[in-house]
Design a protein with these regions (language model features):
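Short active-site oxyanion
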Residues: 29-32, 68-71, 107-111
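Short, well-structured N-terminal submotif of metal-dependent ribonuclease cores
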Residues: 1-37, 49-61, 128
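Acidic, PIN/NYN-like endoribonuclease modules and their adjacent C-terminal/linker elements
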Residues: 1, 39, 100-135
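Acidic catalytic patch
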Residues: 61-90, 97-101
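Short beta-strand scaffold positions
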Residues: 4, 33-34, 74, 94-97, ...
Length: 135
């Protein structure tokens, strides 16, 4: 299973030097998972970077189409409690901790795709196989 955080998922929809790595990792995995927060984060980032309304609508449509294939992990009380623990233990932001807490709920083994370097030590310590530009 491939758990994807928003830093990586966003690269699926924008031109970026990390896009080929993200696309390859997603193509190799038959099962994708992400926190419910990831979809909103990505769609808002695409809205903010869109050069036109048509561009934004096309990007949002692509996210909605792909999201049908994503196993969405809810950001509920259990997830938030675990995120608090992770954030406190590793000194990362709540948003970063939410992505890790969501991935931590998945059955192992989990490959964790992120471009956020702050998450890497925590993800490794949580037992995830890392998929990053540096891994």
């Amino acid at each position: 299973m491939l758990a994807i955080d928003s830093s990586a998922l966003l690269r699926r929809y924008v031109a970026d030097r990390q896009r080929p790595m993200v696309m390859a990792a997603m193509a190799r995995s038959p099962v994708w998972a992400a926190s419910a927060l990831a979809r909103s984060e990505v769609m808002l980032a695409l809205h903010q970077s869109a050069s036109s309304l048509v561009g934004q609508q096309e990007a949002w449509a692509a996210v909605r189409d792909d999201w049908e294939a994503v196993w969405e992990v809810p950001v509920d009380g259990r997830c938030l409690a675990r995120a608090t623990e992770i954030g406190a233990r590793y000194g990362i932001t709540l948003v970063a901790a939410i992505h890790l807490a969501a991935a931590d709920r998945l059955p192992r083994p989990v490959r964790f795709l992120t471009l956020d370097r702050r998450q890497i030590p925590a993800a490794a310590d949580l037992g995830f196989d890392l998929v990053t530009p540096t891994a």
